[in-house]
Amino acid sequence: MTLGSETKTDVEVPIINGKHEIPQEENDSGHSSINTPDSSEPDKQVDKFVKITIQPSCGDAFELHLSDNELVQELYQTLLDREATCHRTCFSLYLNGTAVDNYSEVRAIPGFVDGCTLNVVDEPYTIRDARLHLRQVRELLKFGLTEDQHEPPCTNDAQSYLTTINLQPEEKKEPKPSDILPPDHALPGCKERSLAHLLVPQPKELIALKDIAFSPYNPPPGPRKLRGDVLYIDITTVENRIYHVTCCTRGFYVNNSQDGRFDPTVSNSNKTVYQSVIELLQNVSPGFKKVYPQILKRRQEKTLVERLPTSYPVSSWVGNPLKTDGYMSDSLRAIELTEPFRVGFEDHMPGLLRDWNEELQTTFEMTRKSISERVIRDRSYYKIHADYVNAAARGVQSILDGNILAINPGEDKKTHMYIWNNIFFSLGFDVRDHYKELGGDAAAFAATSTDLQGVRAFATLDDPKLNTLGMAIFDYRGYRVTAQSIIPGILEREQEQSVVYGSIDFGKTVVSDEKYHELLEDAAHKLKMLPHTVISEKDGVKEELKLYTSYEAKGIIGNDGRKYVLDLLRSMPPDVHYLDDAEVSEAAKTLGYPRKFPHKLSALRRELIDAFCESRLVTFIQLTAKKIRDLITESKEKNDETLIKQAAEAETELSLLFMAISEDKEFEAKNKVVQDAIKEACAVVHSIYEDRYVMKFNPDCFSSNVKHAPTENLERQRRVVVDAADFLLTQKIPELVQNLKDCVVQPIDGDNLADIMHINGINIRYLGEIGKRLENSVSFARPLVLSDIVARSAKHVIRKINVQITADQLSASTSHILNCLFSVVLDPSPIAANVAKKANKKNGKKRVTSAWSSLTTSALWNSIREDSASYYGYPIEADSLEKFTELHDIQKTALFRRICKVMGVQLVARDYQLDNSTAKKTSIFVEDDIINFFPIIKHHEPFTADAKKMFIRGQQAMSIGASREAYECIGESLNLMTLVYGVMHPDMPQCLRALARLSHVLGETGDALNNQHKAAVMSERLIGLDAGNTIIEYINLAHFAFGALLIPGSLRPLYRARYLMNLVFGEKHPVMAQIDANIGLILFTVQEFDTALKYLQSADAITKTIGEPRKLKTGLISNLIARTHAARGDFRAALVAEKETFAIYSELYGPNHPRVNESSEYLRTLTQQAVTFQKKMLKLDNSTNITELFQAQPPTVTSLFDTLNIINGILIIGVPGLSSLGKQQNGTTEESKTTDVAAQLDNETLD
């Protein structure tokens, strides 16, 4: 993260006015600062902003504004970001002649005051400094090159399409038709779904240097080292001249070495010693001197959001084909990526390995009492966790490439374990039959996911007293690899000696520890785990022990003295619908539950448990309150003083009960009436106890491996778990299905669908249940859900095949599998036969043919059908993928994309013509289409709770129309996120989008466009170029660009969004109708009526097809269609469309609504115009211009803006005086804005 606000530079600045400002984007809203201290926070140290001067060793001095809590190290990053100083890396900062510490806060530096001057002093080079310098040179020169698609599949460099769109106002008045009219692939009804348009157009390459490499003469011999030589490098310029360069302590100079002759002394022709390689090249290479300024200009044109690396690895499922003449040599890359012992930070920490566990635990335990302490703690923990995930991703790829030796190489490959870079890796197989009774390999695979869910649950606790391991899961090339940090001392002793809490023999023997009880009590309470007693038997002696978690959880005290808890796979209660011998509700039985499942580790999600407990609590409160209300009513009717007194006492005690419940405290009722009310309510809601409300879950109540104590009421405990599962089946799933049918939620792809299901507490295994309920529906969600079932079932089938494939067969096998899916393969693969034949010949013996080689279309489809039935409970009747996609209107390209993404396959971006009937008989895919595999990463994602709370508060303010308060809260949330995460994070686009909408409502068009542009770029780079969220960001960006009257700038994101929607889903989606309505309205505004009509008619047809024909948006679209017909002179069609508008408005609002009256008036106008037009047509002669015969009444710009706002879910309620709000400068400005402006940003409430 960089810092500061500085004139003429491209560095990050503090959050001001709720925005993360970047220089040269001067769209200040004028709103007051939102960074006010929270009085509720104890001991908060208020940050101060100071202005300092920095005097670089080259170039002019410059001023910098920064917060005094920044680290000095961030000043270094500021200098590396500046154009004038980015090429110098070996320096120190001095204040008053004293070097300052890199890792201290600036406020802690003696003499650091407002107005002071820091001097940059060049330091002598070491080999570490030299290597870091060369890396910086390489990073700078990469800005002139196209994105290299063929570097490792998991990188931190992601592309952005929006960099190709100009959103700046231009001087020319009229845009060209080519700037406005759509490309062919964005037209309604377009059948072309080529992936080639998905890639970002690349600018012309700026090549300043051919290669820079370490010389084979390294390291410097002793005599030269004593004279200051550090490193030797060879540089090949664009003029094809090779310069042998010596890096000495003073800098870089050209030496006298030649091919085959070593002479590191200073060259006779160029005796200058340069501080940087860049300065040296500018003096020896004219080509470099010419191109380098252009590279810097291109770099400066990119904002921080566009060019900074992402925190976590990102991948794309498409890329450019490998061209031998386009793959450039890079000696530094060759060294970094071909040496398996390199861990990625040797140049920063030479000779050291990071202790990930110590770093994670130390930062996790940092104090968090005040908000400033929490920011520091969250920022440190997030940064280290991101480094850990990046390191683990690199390790996983090296392991499966065979570059890392297992710690148990003599055992079966599936049991191999690895330690690399102080990270422990294990494969997702059932080693030593640990999960034999639970499902074998399937259970072992699922256990890692449920374990990660447990880690996430413990990490969300406010003050966890126990430590969990750093953990990440990777699905790569068919394997599941789990990466974990290493507990100190765990490898030095047997597991039996390490575990002090839990069981290591599947529940037969359980150990417990009072210290762990104290630490687990609070965690178990917050996670709604019920303390329970089990029986442990050892050496014939039985003992009753109390557990706060499942017996599977293990407590280990590390050599560092910390108390760790791991194996948290049973932190949530089991899902009884997938346990063969479990009792389920009657409703579940009618739906065919319990069902046989590949494993017995199915668990309910925490979101469901929270929703279920909240629902039961509401029911409990309602029942007890009703009992007391009935008593009060009875006492009043009978006028019995005794009853009145009892009712008053009961009402008082009930209030105390409710207060205790709200504060999460225990309460013992003494009043007999209240006691009876509580008992009755507890019986209805199935409380764990008869006489008090407790809704907690025993995670072991359905486990047969552990013996329960006789005192445990298993019947009640199991009934609560059954009720929770029934709540999922009878309330949450029907609620989601109805929301999908009503278009309340509008997922675009499988990732969006999974997120929505998880938010509602629904596991992915219930996809089949949702699919059944949507099967006969016209909802847009039906093809989405069913295609996701097929994609996930295909993933399960292909995963089993991939683990049997050697590295040399990956391209052939993957292309063959895709051909089996999307074309017709009747015979085994000839490629496979050749591969097997060569392998058999090489080994001199017969080998078993690979599973993929005999695969055919029918065999693969039958396997997918079997998996769909066994895993998702959804029987696929169609006997081929072709019939299945036709039956359910599934777009093949969307299904193809989803399968590639869940498999982690990267393919060449070209037109595969999956819907071409002639291509089905041939091989659509070839080996060269497969570029690479990339890992699918799952991990616990640290977050800042303070930012989330502020964002929720802002959303609440937004929902009641308090725009000013909402803007401040969400701006403060973005401020906190920036302090913790840096410039980019997946949570930030949501904040920026909300700020953009609020700015739009408040009339700040520039701010709205600026914030939304950042949101869209972040979404592209962090989530994906074709992700569902990215499409939504494009629509919002187009909206605000239109508000700024940037017509081409508003249409190009919409055309891109339409192409992506056609690729990701297809046309029959409410978001596609929204896109077409936007395009049609904007084209109508610029009088491109014929093209506008195509889009408006498409929007109207889609809206009616997906089952929402009678809504406000439909009426608005019909009105626009009528006006477009009228503008074209087709009054008969205009009348038909407007009559439909009138009918919709009448049904929605009744006869006297302004919209109904307006539509009625427009019908009369159209009728009059049609009559007038017909009369003039009768008098027509050859000299008459037909366009002069009618005068269409165009809508006002204001009405068009209002229509666009409603289509995109923004309702602005204006009041008199709104237009003058921006001009008010008195003390009541803020109050008047809050009072006069109400913004409702919920899309569906408009309908």
UniProtKB/Swiss-Prot annotation:
It is found in: Cytoplasm. Gene3D superfamilies: Hypothetical protein (hspc210), Tetratricopeptide repeat domain. Residues 1-43, 1222-1247 are annotated as: Disordered. The keyword Cytoplasm applies. GO terms for biological process: intracellular distribution of mitochondria; mitochondrion organization. GO terms for cellular component: cytoplasm. Residues 329-579 form the Clu domain. Coiled coil: none annotated. Keywords: Cytoplasm. It comes from the Eukaryota. The keyword Cytoplasm applies. GO terms for molecular function: mRNA binding. Residues 30-39 have a biased composition (Polar residues). Its main location: cytoplasm. PANTHER family: CLUSTERED MITOCHONDRIA PROTEIN HOMOLOG, EUKARYOTIC TRANSLATION INITIATION FACTOR 3 SUBUNIT EIF-3. Belongs to the CLU family. mRNA-binding protein involved in proper cytoplasmic distribution of mitochondria. This is Clustered mitochondria protein homolog.
